[in-house]
């Protein structure tokens, strides 16, 4: 049984981590911090956890966190990097659900997040936690940068094409049209997130530039093993009036080799042994409700024209897009079965 700390337990990803870990047979949450709710019983804030935990929120105490085997940071950007060095020096592993350890390019990090990186030496040795593509590195990692929710759908949606020995798509012409529920913006109060602003509404945001764009580009370059081939990639996120769920529609142009390839078979073979990636039959329609609450991503392919491919990827942004994937990474780091604590089936209806 490993000891777990969660920094930032009152946000949506923090409480989702707790919900998942309370069912984990080999992990016990010992520390759950909150800047504003210290001393308050967790079940008073989250009634779904009544009868499942007697934990209270506490102030952030680095010495208490050092007693844990692993600490998750479900905090705003910039928090994990302030504490990572002290924790790993004490032998504690770190999994950050914010962006502190996602981008290896410091210039891009500082541009998009508006802060200097506090521990570039730790960043250099950290591992990007896209589980299905970085398993062996994750097993050896001390610090994990958990991927963003949108980048998770994009990478898993494109990986079979980019990992192929042949160039199957035109990498400079990729268009990503992505939609997310409002929980992706976090739990903090803001005018744009209140009910009357979002109900009966559907809007694009970050059209001129979104923080996940440089993460997507850097990650795809690593998957493809090529630099500067995704300059023309377009990424536009949208906000839909639902709480959780994400659907990314990815448009690509096929090369001559791509036109001749059985792409359905390519995807099915690539993900044949993956428990948390479901390749649906061709021309299917993955629905966000089918993965609600589950650590699963569903993919479907359409080929409307001989030289065009459309990839649909659906996930729960709080689970496979955040906390579930973080626990998946924790399982690898400690030698557990990858699906420990993550066998839950999506909630439907």
Curated annotation (Swiss-Prot):
GO biological process, one term: L-arginine biosynthetic process
Pathway linked to the protein: Amino-acid biosynthesis; L-arginine biosynthesis; N(2)-acetyl-L-ornithine from L-glutamate: step 3/4
Keyword Transit peptide attributed: no
One of the Pfam families matching this protein, by short name: Semialdhyde_dh
NCBIfam families according to UniProt: argC
Similarity-based family: Belongs to the NAGSA dehydrogenase family. Type 1 subfamily.
Protein name in UniProt: N-acetyl-gamma-glutamyl-phosphate reductase
Organism phylogeny: Bacteria, Pseudomonadati, Pseudomonadota, Gammaproteobacteria, Moraxellales
């Amino acid at each position: 049984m490993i000891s777990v700390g969660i920094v930032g337990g009152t946000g949506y990803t923090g409480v989702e981590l707790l919900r998942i870990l309370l069912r984990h047979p080999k992990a016990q949450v010992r520390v759950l911090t909150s800047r504003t709710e210290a001393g308050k019983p967790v079940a008073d804030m989250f009634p779904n956890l009544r009868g499942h935990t007697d934990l209270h929120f506490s102030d952030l105490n680095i010495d208490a966190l050092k007693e844990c085997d692993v600490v998750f940071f479900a905090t705003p950007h910039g928090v994990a990097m302030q504490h990572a060095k002290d924790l790993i020096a004490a032998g504690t592993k770190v999994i950050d659900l914010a962006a502190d350890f996602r981008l290896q390019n410091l210039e891009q990090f500082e541009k998009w997040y508006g802060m200097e990186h506090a521990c570039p030496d730790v960043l250099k040795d950290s591992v990007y936690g896209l589980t299905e593509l970085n398993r062996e590195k994750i097993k050896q990692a001390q610090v994990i940068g958990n991927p963003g929710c949108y980048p998770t759908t994009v990478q898993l949606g494109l990986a079979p094409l980019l990992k192929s020995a042949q160039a199957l798509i035109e990498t400079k012409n990729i268009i990503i049209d992505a939609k997310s529920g409002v929980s992706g913006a976090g739990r903090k109060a803001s005018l744009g997130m209140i009910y009357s602003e979002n109900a009966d509404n559907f809007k694009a945001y970050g059209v001129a530039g979104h923080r996940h764009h440089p993460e997507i580009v850097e990650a795809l370059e690593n998957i493809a093993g090529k630099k500067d081939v995704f300059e023309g990639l377009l990424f536009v996120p949208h906000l839909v009036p639902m709480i959780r769920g994400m659907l990314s529609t990815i448009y690509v142009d096929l090369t001559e080799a791509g036109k001749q390839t059985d792409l359905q078979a390519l995807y099915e073979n690539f993900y044949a042994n993956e428990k948390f990636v479901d390749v649906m039959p061709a021309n299917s329609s993955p629905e966000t409700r089918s993965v609600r609450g589950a650590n699963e991503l569903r993919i479907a392919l359409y080929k409307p024209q001989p030289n065009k491919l459309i990839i649909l990827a659906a996930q729960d942004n709080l689970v496979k897009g955040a906390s579930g994937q973080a626990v998946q990474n924790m399982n690898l780091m400690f030698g557990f079965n990858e699906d420990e604590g993550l066998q839950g089936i999506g909630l439907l209806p």
